Swiss-Prot record:
It comes from Geobacillus thermodenitrificans (strain NG80-2). This is Probable transaldolase. It catalyses: D-sedoheptulose 7-phosphate + D-glyceraldehyde 3-phosphate = D-erythrose 4-phosphate + beta-D-fructose 6-phosphate. GO terms for molecular function: aldehyde-lyase activity; transaldolase activity. The lineage of its organism: Bacteria, Bacillati, Bacillota, Bacilli, Bacillales. One of its GO terms (cellular component) is cytoplasm.
Length: 213
């Protein structure tokens, strides 16, 4: 499973990139708004750091508007992926983008049927939202398993991005259940490194070494 980072913060992206684990970035209007910067300028900055997929979301709700926005976003850099909501109008736009060779990430996926529809429309990625499903008492991880099974049975090449990741357990379980990618907030990404026994082991090795000097 690959790691994307879910942020529009340049320092977070730079740090994750320096770690050598970053395969891409996902953004959304809310994340960009927090940064108080021009959307297009921030995308240019991100794509200058990251060579993998960078998801940029359209804000129009009709297919013609999404297509117009998406085509402009795609001009920013060749690794821009157009993020489109899981709606009938969104899938019309996905089909149009697919025919033009523009990559797409269908977001706000909450059912396997939605994921299948998005894949058949030509989506490069589908993004089921684990945390938001958990919030309403549904099993987001079970959804990952179901989508992965359906895609495997039918030879569908659309990749599954586990999104709305809340904690490290989501990452482990998404990997076990067949997600191709986890898009992870910076805070959770850093938590993946941590274990008290790792820290204790380092301290012991250093103490043992220093005693011999």
């Amino acid at each position: 499973m690959k790691f994307f980072i879910d942020t529009a913060n340049l320092e977070e992206i730079k740090h994750a990139h320096e770690l050598g684990i970053l395969a891409g970035v996902t953004t959304n209007p809310s994340l960009v708004a927090k940064e108080n910067v021009s959307f297009h300028d921030r995308l240019r900055e991100i794509t200058s750091i990251v060579s993998g997929s960078v998801s940029a979301e359209v804000i129009s709700t009709d297919a013609p508007g999404m297509i117009e926005e998406g085509e402009e976003l795609a001009k920013i850099a060749p690794n821009i992926t157009i993020k489109v909501p899981m709606t009938p109008e969104g899938l019309k736009a996905v089909k149009a983008f697919s025919e033009k060779g523009i990559k797409t990430n269908v977001t706000l996926v909450f059912t396997a049927n939605q994921a299948l529809l998005a894949a058949r429309a030509g989506a490069t990625y589908v993004s089921p939202f684990l945390g938001r499903l958990d919030d309403i008492g549904h099993n987001g991880l079970e959804l990952i398993s179901t989508i992965a099974d359906i895609f495997n049975i039918h030879g569908i090449e659309t990749e599954i991005i586990a999104a709305s990741i809340r904690h490290p357990h989501h990452v482990t379980e998404a990997a076990l259940r067949g997600a191709h990618i986890a898009t992870v907030p910076y805070k959770v990404l850093m938590q993946l490194f941590n274990h008290p026994l790792t820290d204790q082991g380092i301290e012991k090795f250093l103490a043992d070494w220093n005693r011999q000097q």
